[in-house]
Amino acid sequence: MKEKTYEFFSSIQTTEVEWLWYPYIPYGKITILQGDPGEGKSTFILNIAARLTKGKDMPDGFKTSMAYPVIYQCAEDNPSDTIKPRLVAAGADCSKVAFIVDSDMNLTLDDSRIETTVQEVGARLLILDPLQSFMVQDGDMHSASRMRSILGRLAVIAENVNSSSEIFEQL
């Protein structure tokens, strides 16, 4: 007998989306924040991360249930003279903001350290700033099929651990 290659939506059980910030950033999904350099993408997302680390409401009053850890992975700025001062200025609890040390091997989107760290830290938000810096060497950002493949692993991680993945892309 031939294996069935389709399914009807009537057999699917619907589920509710859980939100970090409704209707902008869902848990278990990827969110992409895109813009030109200098438009405030990092400032904006660090403010959101800071609120999450302290369990504070989002800018429009959307309630967060409690404080959660965050992973902020930035390939362009120094942790001590740029990133931590920005986190402090945003009001983050820096004991709840982690980053993956990539001294021996550059971190890429297909690196198992991402999933391991998200699980170990218990992060509800993973921020990769900017996307281009975490592409695998053969990652062609102009190929839709290649980008789907690369981001697919990150989407699976976000869904499996019910975290939100926020990705920055420079125009």
Residue ranges and their predicted role:
Residues Y6-F9, T15-E16, L20-Y22, P26, ...:
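Conserved inter-motif catalytic segment of the P-loop NTP-binding fold
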Residues T53:
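Gly/Ala-rich phosphate-binding loop of Rossmann-like dinucleotide-binding domains
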Residues Q73, I127-L128, N162-Q170:
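Structural recognition of the conserved hydrophobic beta-strand(s) that form the central parallel beta-sheet
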Residues E159:
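Helix-to-beta-strand junctions that scaffold the AdoMet/dcAdoMet cofactor pocket
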Residues M1-K4:
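Charged, amphipathic alpha-helical linker segments immediately N-terminal to NTP-binding catalytic cores
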Residues I30:
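Walker A (P-loop) ATP-phosphate-binding motif of ABC ATPase nucleotide-binding domains
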Residues F44, I48:
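Hydrophobic positions on the alpha1 helix immediately C-terminal to the Walker A/P-loop
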